[in-house]
Amino acid sequence: DDGVEMTEEEVKRGIMDTVKNAAKDLAGQLLDKLKCKITAC
């Protein structure tokens, strides 16, 4: 086993992690924009 092959579980976990991180980034950006609208930065 050279470590290249990933099980389906590992692949799913990796995708979920990526999605979660992307969602967090997106949510942060949206929150910043909302704050700017409310407080006029």
Swiss-Prot record:
GO CC terms in record: extracellular region
Its biological purpose: Antimicrobial peptide.
Coiled-coil spans in chain: none
Major localization listed first in the record, in broad terms: secreted
Compartment annotation: Secreted
Positions of the propeptide removed during maturation: 1-11
Disulfide bonds listed in the record: C36-C41
Keywords: Amphibian defense peptide, Antibiotic, Antimicrobial, Cleavage on pair of basic residues, Disulfide bond, Secreted
Protein name, per record: Ranatuerin-2PLg
Family: Belongs to the frog skin active peptide (FSAP) family. Ranatuerin subfamily.
GO BP annotations, alphabetical order: defense response to Gram-negative bacterium
Organism: Lithobates palustris
Superkingdom: Eukaryota
